[in-house]
């Protein structure tokens, strides 16, 4: 009797392969060559790193958004004897995300640039591993509609939303009342300024804002954590992912970042997901779901941790969190405007053009000025994003620090 045919490897497209989430995804893939293979790897402009990844993982496709960088990569791979086909431009991101031969898509491109390929993967019915916040913040209704209509499988990668997903009943059909879900509790570390005097926040430097106490992250998301806008965006995401109203989503400051989030049920039970702060855990969970695989993560030692602390968020210290709740309640284009204004304000702060405490001021002023924008299709969403950025830039100029 012949041996059974081994199962086909799952083909994984990694959008944003050279970023933090992309590299962690490839780390997990490399640990399980018997289960997964890289189908397509994409990047914005990082030729050298993508070249190295192509030699290591031999994907069928490599995509660089920058055409000159793509030409450079194509020549280098050809000289190295690689069979990887190099594609260029934003349209190529959409093509590989929706490619019929790909099984799963890690959507890890940061910012509005990641929206179109993530939406394409959802419309193509893929298993979508969603790490791109903007897909839901900018286009929550549109994105979830695409998931439902295509039968795509949506698995959240943010550690908080992945924790909520794990604490919900398997097969949860976005019906909290039927499942007895009372509240979703999103944990937040509180960032580096949880205990710093409010008066001194105006003097915060970019390096201080990027020094997160628990997680290793990029500079933009580190600033978002310092302002707690990151948690505000996650509140909006949770609303769309789990169909929970804003008043049933509570943020809990938990400095140790051991409990990644919780779900409270009607019978009084609270289910929590715990683990060391390592993004490979939610990535491995989503790749193998409903099975469990090794992620290379150090086991959690509760005795080493000793105790867990919880606090209410301080909305005076963190006005960005309040702005996010307000945008979610307002609906329409408010969340898209919030996100665009935040990206522009954070970029200006990192360039030392505005102070740290100016970030929420710029966002609030942009929300006030950029109203009545449409978000009923992807073109309208991107237009609202662009118009909000124009307004935010004018608000930045009005507050810009003189050299």
Curated annotation (Swiss-Prot):
Pathway it works in: Isoprenoid biosynthesis; isopentenyl diphosphate biosynthesis via DXP pathway; isopentenyl diphosphate from 1-deoxy-D-xylulose 5-phosphate: step 1/6
Manganese found in the keyword field: yes
Keywords annotated in UniProt: Isoprene biosynthesis, Manganese, Metal-binding, NADP, Oxidoreductase
Keyword Metal-binding assigned: yes
Residue numbers binding Mn(2+): 158, 160, 234
Record Pfam families: DXP_redisom_C, DXP_reductoisom, DXPR_C
Family annotation (InterPro entries): DXP_reductoisomerase, DXP_reductoisomerase_C, DXP_reductoisomerase_N, DXPR_C, DXPR_C_sf, NAD(P)-bd_dom_sf
Class of the enzyme per the UniProt entry, highest EC level: oxidoreductase
BP terms from Gene Ontology: isopentenyl diphosphate biosynthetic process, methylerythritol 4-phosphate pathway involved in terpenoid biosynthetic process
Binding-site positions, 1-deoxy-D-xylulose 5-phosphate: 133, 159-160, 189, 212, 225, 230-231, 234
Disulfide pairings: none
Residue numbers binding NADPH: 18-21, 46, 132, 134, 218
Gene Ontology molecular functions: 1-deoxy-D-xylulose-5-phosphate reductoisomerase activity; manganese ion binding; NADPH binding
EC nos: 1.1.1.267
SUPFAM superfamilies the UniProt entry points to: 1-deoxy-D-xylulose-5-phosphate reductoisomerase, C-terminal domain (SSF69055), Glyceraldehyde-3-phosphate dehydrogenase-like, C-terminal domain (SSF55347), NAD(P)-binding Rossmann-fold domains (SSF51735)
Top-level division of the source organism's lineage: Bacteria
Listed cofactors: Mg(2+); Mn(2+)
Function, in words: Catalyzes the NADPH-dependent rearrangement and reduction of 1-deoxy-D-xylulose-5-phosphate (DXP) to 2-C-methyl-D-erythritol 4-phosphate (MEP).
PANTHER family: 1-DEOXY-D-XYLULOSE 5-PHOSPHATE REDUCTOISOMERASE, 1-DEOXY-D-XYLULOSE 5-PHOSPHATE REDUCTOISOMERASE, CHLOROPLASTIC
NCBIfam families: Dxr, PRK05447.1-1, PRK12464.1
Recorded family membership: Belongs to the DXR family.
Protein name in the entry: 1-deoxy-D-xylulose 5-phosphate reductoisomerase
Source organism (scientific name): Aromatoleum aromaticum (strain DSM 19018 / LMG 30748 / EbN1)
């Amino acid at each position: 009797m012949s041996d059974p045919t081994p199962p086909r490897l799952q083909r994984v497209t990694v959008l944003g392969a050279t970023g933090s989430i992309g590299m962690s995804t490839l780390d997990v893939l490399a640990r399980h060559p018997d289960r997964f293979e890289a189908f397509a790897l994409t990047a914005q402009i990082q030729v050298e790193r993508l070249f190295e990844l192509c030699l290591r993982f031999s994907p069928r496709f490599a995509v660089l958004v920058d055409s000159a960088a793509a030409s450079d990569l194509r020549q280098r791979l050809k000289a190295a004897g690689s069979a990887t086909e190099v594609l260029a431009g934003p349209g190529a991101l959409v093509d590989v995300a929706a490619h019929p031969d790909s099984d799963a898509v890690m959507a890890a491109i940061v910012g509005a640039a990641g929206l179109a390929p993530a939406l394409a993967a959802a419309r193509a019915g893929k298993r979508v591993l969603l790490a791109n916040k903007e897909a839901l913040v900018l286009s929550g209704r549109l994105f979830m509609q695409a998931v439902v209509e295509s039968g795509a499988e949506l698995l959240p990668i943010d550690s908080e939303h992945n924790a909520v997903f794990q604490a919900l009943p398997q097969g949860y059909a976005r019906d909290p009342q039927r499942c007895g879900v009372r509240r979703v509790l999103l944990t937040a570390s509180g960032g580096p300024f949880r205990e710093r005097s409010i008066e001194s926040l105006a003097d915060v430097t970019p390096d201080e804002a990027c020094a997160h106490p628990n997680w290793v992250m990029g500079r933009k998301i580190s600033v978002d954590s310092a302002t707690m806008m990151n948690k505000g965006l996650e509140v909006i995401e949770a609303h769309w992912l789990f169909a929970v109203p804003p008043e049933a989503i509570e943020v809990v400051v938990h400095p140790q970042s051991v409990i990644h989030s919780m779900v409270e049920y009607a019978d009084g039970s609270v289910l929590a997901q715990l683990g060391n702060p390592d993004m490979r855990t939610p990535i491995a969970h989503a790749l193998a779901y409903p099975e469990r695989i090794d992620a290379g993560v150090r086991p959690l030692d509760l005795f080493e941790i000793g105790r867990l602390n919880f606090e209410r968020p301080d909305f005076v210290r963190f006005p960005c969190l309040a702005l996010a709740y307000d945008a979610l309640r307002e609906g329409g284009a408010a969340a898209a405007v919030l996100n665009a204004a935040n990206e522009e304000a954070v970029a200006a702060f990192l360039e030392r053009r505005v102070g740290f405490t100016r970030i929420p001021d710029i966002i609030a002023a942009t929300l006030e000025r950029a109203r009545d924008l449409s978000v009923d299709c992807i073109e309208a969403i991107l237009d609202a994003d662009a118009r909000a950025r124009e307004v935010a830039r004018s608000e930045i100029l009005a507050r810009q620090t003189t050299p």
